[in-house]
Curated annotation (Swiss-Prot):
It comes from Mycobacterium tuberculosis (strain ATCC 25618 / H37Rv). It comes from the Bacteria. PROSITE patterns: SUMT_1 (PS00839), SUMT_2 (PS00840). Belongs to the precorrin methyltransferase family. This is Cobalamin biosynthesis protein CobIJ. PANTHER family: COBALT-FACTOR III C(17)-METHYLTRANSFERASE-RELATED. Disulfide bonds: none annotated.
Length: 508
């Protein structure tokens, strides 16, 4: 019995026969059998590319797809028709390999990059040895045709199939530094819609049949979507956003701390900025990028940071002002917008993020599940009597309270005063969630989250790194496997009905 043959997955490159690699040309010429695909019309693009390298007397296997985009009467539908085709093609190739013949199975582009070859590779490599000969991809050929740098430095290239749903494609394009969308054809309408929805249609190129005599390069917005072939792609080069965003200030929320809680939009804004402004500790959480200028400061002079941001933007810079948590919650958005009133030529955008209250609440369950108020205990920017009046009103309204800035090195008495105000309206057993250094999906080494009764809240244990959540009369607290769970039901007792249900957990 002769030795089995070897399956060669041969990448032909994007279409120009001169872009076939030296190794691919040799393997094609030496193979006993050359196999290639085609649509039902019978014309094989792969064979046309490889023809200069074929030799007389070679066996050929023409694998004709039964269906591509047209309808089928196969009982299993489109998927069933293709499954039968792949099963038949697998056995045809296997017959040659079993007979000891080496088979070169051709693939446009690269064999393992959105290729027809892969469907047979996964089936045949269970039984036979396979060797891959890589090829120049359509992405490289299209980039050469556009003659514009595609990605540079630490930019990330996203390669996306045009068959994705419009919403998903829009999201991924908006998040990308640079992108290439393949598998166009009938999907181009959706691709164009996604490019438009993400504000990127004017930056994108359309490349058709790259590297061949039929190559065309057009602005993506100018393409007649009724005549787009499958062998085409849309290209969105990197480095375009910085020019578009000059003269702007983006106030960017970093989230509570861990980079896993930073949104893609925030990452995108930070990457596009020419200048980063913020408290030094917050800037340290932002990845360093070549060419960006950083303007760190301490954590007190917000007006000065806002003035610097507007001044730089007025000079044509793309400025990002960073805030921990959400920039609109006791953070920099207010200061920047207030300053921007004096700079009519400066555009300000606020980029939202996860808040500290949301982060702490997630650790114990859903204490913010019903109406709640957010109050800062800091009296640096407003007098204590205003804070006390708001605490009293919120307590009387039976709202859950999220308490920001509860204490600092120089401000230590407000937590105790708050506790006494609330005890005039709340049951002493109401749960208070104390969250310290909650900063990511996984608890960090410095994180501490506890639940105590309102009457047991100890001001000496609270500092600036803490956020407090004080329950309402309906908030419930229980333990599972020594873990505190706290939630506030969405429903509320009807007016006039007794509300004696206590939120404290049962006494031991």
């Amino acid at each position: 019995m002769s030795a089995r043959g070897t399956l060669w997955g041969v990448g032909l490159g994007p279409g120009d026969p001169e872009l076939v690699t030296v190794k691919a040309a040799r393997v094609i010429g030496e193979a006993d059998v050359v196999a290639y695909h085609s649509a039902p019309h019978g014309h094989s693009i792969a064979r046309g590319i490889a023809e200069p390298y074929l030799r007389p007397g070679q066996l050929e296997e023409h694998l004709v797809y039964p269906v591509t985009t047209e309808a089928t009467n196969h009982p299993g539908g489109y998927a069933g028709a293709l499954e039968d085709f792949y099963a038949d093609a697998t056995e045809r190739i296997a017959t040659h390999l079993d007979a000891g013949r080496n088979v070169a199975l051709l693939a446009e582009g690269d064999p393992l990059f959105y290729s027809s070859y892969m469907h047979l590779h996964t089936r045949l490599t269970r039984r036979f040895n396979a060797v891959i000969v890589p090829g120049v991809t359509s992405v490289s050929a299209a980039s050469a045709a556009v003659a514009t740098p595609l990605v540079a430095g630490d930019q990330v290239l996203s390669v996306l199939p045009g068959t994705l749903p419009v919403g998903e494609l829009t999201r991924r394009l908006a998040d990308a530094d640079a992108a290439v969308v393949v598998k166009l054809g009938r999907s181009y309408h959706n691709v164009r819609e996604a490019l438009s929805a993400s504000g990127l249609l004017g930056d994108a190129f359309y490349v058709e049949r790259a590297s061949t005599a039929g190559q065309r390069v057009l602005p993506a917005a100018d393409v007649d979507e009724t005549s787009v072939p499958y062998f085409s792609l849309a290209m969105l080069p990197g480095g375009r956003r910085r020019a578009l965003l000059t003269g702007t200030v983006a106030v960017v929320g970093l989230g509570p701390g861990d980079s896993d809680w930073m949104t893609p939009q925030s990452r995108r804004e930070l990457a596009a900025a020419t200048d980063l402004i913020g408290y030094r500790g917050y800037l340290d959480r932002v990845e360093v990028r070549d060419g960006q200028r950083r303007h760190p400061s301490d954590n007190t002079d917000e007006p000065a940071r806002a003035r610097l941001a507007c001044s730089l933007a007025d000079q044509g810079r793309a400025v990002a002002v960073v805030s921990s948590g959400d920039p609109g919650v006791f953070a920099m958005a207010t200061a920047v917008l207030e300053e921007a009133e004096q700079w009519p030529g400066v555009r300000v955008r606020v980029i939202p993020a996860m808040t500290a209250a949301q982060a702490v609440a997630s650790r114990v369950g859903a204490p913010l599940g019903h109406d709640y108020a957010v109050i800062s205990l800091s009296d640096r920017l407003k007098p204590w009597d205003v804070i006390a009046a708001r605490l009293t009103a919120a307590a009387a309204a039976d709202l859950v309270l999220a308490i920001y800035n509860p204490a600092s090195v120089t401000r230590t008495w407000q937590v105790g005063a708050m506790r006494e105000l609330l005890l005039a309206h709340r049951d002493p057993g109401i749960p208070v969630v104390i969250g310290r250094n909650v900063s990511g999906p996984v608890s960090g080494p410095n994180e501490d989250v506890r639940v105590v009764k309102l009457a047991d809240l100890n001001p000496a244990e609270i500092d600036m790194r803490c956020l407090l959540i004080v329950g309402s009369s309906q908030t419930r607290w229980y333990s599972v496997d020594s873990q505190d769970r706290v939630f506030t039901p969405r429903r509320y007792p009807e007016a006039g009905r007794a509300t004696a249900t206590k939120s404290s957990r049962h006494s031991d």
